[in-house]
């Protein structure tokens, strides 16, 4: 039986972004493995027929010795099982996994990078960026590896490294959503509108800009609008806004945090406007879901986000890190019921 390896930093990301593909591969006769860090989903995945190999990825990536340990564990498993296809998902898994694949003589490798990341491309932290670029040149240079990127900016950047043939670089816009689950629905039409931030509570997702924009609009709309944050405080992410700090910024019956939601469809259907002021993305699943459900969107004019919105057609694009522009765009949609419905239909 052919073996297909999925390799990603953490099991919950695999469930949200790759599980349907894995289940389809099983139906086609593949023996599917997930090599990832177990955060409590191992038994669930094994129940789906997926073989689980625990690799202790550290998402903060601050210990080089730990990264070498992960490479060695990947190498050992690649040598032991000799998979027919290795599918690395996320930048870190692709970097470490590609080194392990080269060392073990594996050639059928697909690196799916959902976003190169704001910290890698923002022009700051030059030493870290130089290190990552060096690692990319070492890990990814191969005539046999293939790459899947989610937006044209990332495609251009990977092509600029000149590491693999251009014919091995593919643009697939996003990880997709199940349209049987995320179906178009009319906005709730309640007296109190809801503005939704559907993302982890991270600074580079624009969480502070969302909260700042809400507070700029507070005098005009308190009692008429509620701003909802639906996402986890990802404590392992260096860009996390801590839970204590977040709670200090909430406003009763105006800015509310509902935490991680396993089922997002009812959250979208109960919302009127979706907002993601991120600094950079691959192509955010949350915005694809919002489009599928038929919600107007306010997001930033940055790689990944701009691919989901045609400004003035299904939402508005605003500059990153601009709370005032964000507030103005949200305010336009709050005040214009007809525009919200039009943009929602166009999504």
Question: Across the structure, where does each feature detected by a protein language model lie?
Answer:
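Conserved acidic donor-binding segment of nucleotide-sugar-dependent glycosyltransferases
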Residues: 311-312, 316-323, 332-338
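Membrane-proximal helix-turn-helix segments that form the acceptor-binding/catalytic region
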Residues: 21-28, 72-75, 129-148
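Donor nucleotide-sugar binding/catalytic pocket of nucleotide-sugar-dependent glycosyltransferases
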Residues: 53, 133-184, 197
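Aromatic "clamp/platform" in nucleotide-sugar-dependent glycosyltransferases that forms part
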Residues: 260, 279
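Conserved donor-binding/catalytic core segment of Leloir-type glycosyltransferases
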Residues: 186-205, 210-215, 227-228
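Short hydrophobic beta-strand element within catalytic cores of glycosyltransferases
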Residues: 296-299, 309
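Nucleotide-activated donor-binding/catalytic signature segment of Leloir-type glycosyltransferases, i.e.
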Residues: 231, 240-259
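Glycosyltransferase donor-sugar binding loop
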Residues: 36-40, 198, 226-241
């Amino acid at each position: 039986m052919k073996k297909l390896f999925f390799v990603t930093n953490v099991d919950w990301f695999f469930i949200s972004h790759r599980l349907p593909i894995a289940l389809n591969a099983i139906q086609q006769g593949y023996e599917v493995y997930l090599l990832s860090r177990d955060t409590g989903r191992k038994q669930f995945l094994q129940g789906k027929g997926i073989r689980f190999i625990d690799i202790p990825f550290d998402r903060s990536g601050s210990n080089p010795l730990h990264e070498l340990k992960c490479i060695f564990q990947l190498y050992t498993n690649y040598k032991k099982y000799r998979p027919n296809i290795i599918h690395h998902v996320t930048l870190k898994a692709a970097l470490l996994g590609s080194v392990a694949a080269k060392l073990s003589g594996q050639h059928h490798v697909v690196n799916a990078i959902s976003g190169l990341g704001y910290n890698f491309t923002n022009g700051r932290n030059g030493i870290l960026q130089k290190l990552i670029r060096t690692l990319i040149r070492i890990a990814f240079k191969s005539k046999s590896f293939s790459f899947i990127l989610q937006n044209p900016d990332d495609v251009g950047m990977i092509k600029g490294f000149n590491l693999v043939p251009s014919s091995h670089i593919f643009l697939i816009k996003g990880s997709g959503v199940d349209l049987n689950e995320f179906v178009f629905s009319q906005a709730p039409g309640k007296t109190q509108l809801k503005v939704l931030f559907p993302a982890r509570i991270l600074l580079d997702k624009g969480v502070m800009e969302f909260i700042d924009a809400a507070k700029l609009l507070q005098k005009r709309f308190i009692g008429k609008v509620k701003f909802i944050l639906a996402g986890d405080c990802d404590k392992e992410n260096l860009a996390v806004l801590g839970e204590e700090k977040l709670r200090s910024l909430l406003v009763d019956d105006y800015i509310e945090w509902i935490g991680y939601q396993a089922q997002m469809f009812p959250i979208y259907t109960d919302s009127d406007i979706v907002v993601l002021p991120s600094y950079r993305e691959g192509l955010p699943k949350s915005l694809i879901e919002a489009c599928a459900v038929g919600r107007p969107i306010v997001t930033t004019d940055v790689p990944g986000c701009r691919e989901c919105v045609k400004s003035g057609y299904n939402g508005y694009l605003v500059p990153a890190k601009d709370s005032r522009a964000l507030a103005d765009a949200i305010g336009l949609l709050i005040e214009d019921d007809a525009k919200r419905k039009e943009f929602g239909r166009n999504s």
